Regions:
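Subset of outer-membrane beta-barrel
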Residues: 33, 43, 58-62, 66-68
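Flexible loop and strand-edge segments within Gram-negative outer membrane beta-barrel domains
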Residues: 47-54, 58, 68, 72-122, ...
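Outer-envelope beta-barrel architecture signal
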Residues: 7-11, 23-25, 34-38, 59, ...
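Short strand-turn segments of transmembrane beta-barrel domains in outer membranes
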Residues: 2-31, 41-42, 47-54
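C-terminal extensions
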Residues: 16, 70, 137, 143-177
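Transmembrane beta-barrel strands of outer-membrane/channel proteins
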Residues: 13-17, 40-44, 77-83, 123-129, ...
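Residues on the lipid-exposed face of transmembrane beta-strands in outer-membrane beta-barrel proteins
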Residues: 27-31, 63-67, 110-114, 158-164
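Transmembrane beta-barrel architecture of outer-membrane proteins
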Residues: 22-24, 58-60, 103-107, 153-161, ...
């Protein structure tokens, strides 16, 4: 995502429509006022697919807030969420029934970054999570499954690195995760 360099507000909307009732939409708002900057994006995408039981639908959102502490240091936090529903009919010769997925994923992070003429780096905290509900479906002549794949996951961590250009054409980076 590009940061806005000059003070002001920019808002944009993208809409697309295609065959099989396919929609691709996105709305974005960017703000820069003094040392503060933000971006907020929301999207909705869907299609019926080119075959029965091949639908896909996705909702997404992203937010980033940032603040320049001084010319060389800034802090930021962001959040990215998406949820999608998908159906898979199998192949034409080997159809699958009720093969449906409902998946939600998210990510958030916080960063303290520095940028000088010959060195730059960051301290970052990140957290990712997801919730998955998947029906593997069943084939012709089979019984529907009496269970679902359900999963929840979480991952978090801290990353620190500093990079320096000691001479022209050189960059040395050290860090830990």
């Amino acid at each position: 995502t590009r940061r806005q360099r000059e003070d002001g507000v920019r808002t944009g909307v993208r809409l697309g429509y295609g065959s099989y009732d396919t929609w691709m939409t996105e709305a974005t708002n960017q703000v820069k006022k003094g040392r503060f900057n933000s971006i907020i994006t929301g999207s909705y995408n869907r299609t019926n697919g080119h075959r029965p039981d091949m639908e896909f639908e996705q909702y997404g959102g992203y937010t980033r807030l940032g603040y320049e502490l001084d010319h060389s240091w800034n802090v930021s936090a962001d959040l990215n969420l998406t949820h999608f529903n998908a159906s898979n009919p199998g192949t034409v010769s080997t159809p699958v029934f009720d093969n449906d997925s409902r998946i939600t994923r998210g990510m958030t992070s916080f960063a303290l970054e520095n940028r000088y003429e010959r060195t730059s780096g960051a301290l970052k905290f990140f957290y990712n999570w997801g919730k998955h509900h998947i029906n593997d479906g069943y084939g012709t002549g089979e019984e529907p499954l009496d269970y679902r794949f359900n999963s929840k996951d979480r991952m978090m961590g801290i990353s620190w690195y500093q990079s320096a250009s000691l001479f022209s054409g050189n960059r040395l980076t050290a860090g830990i995760d």
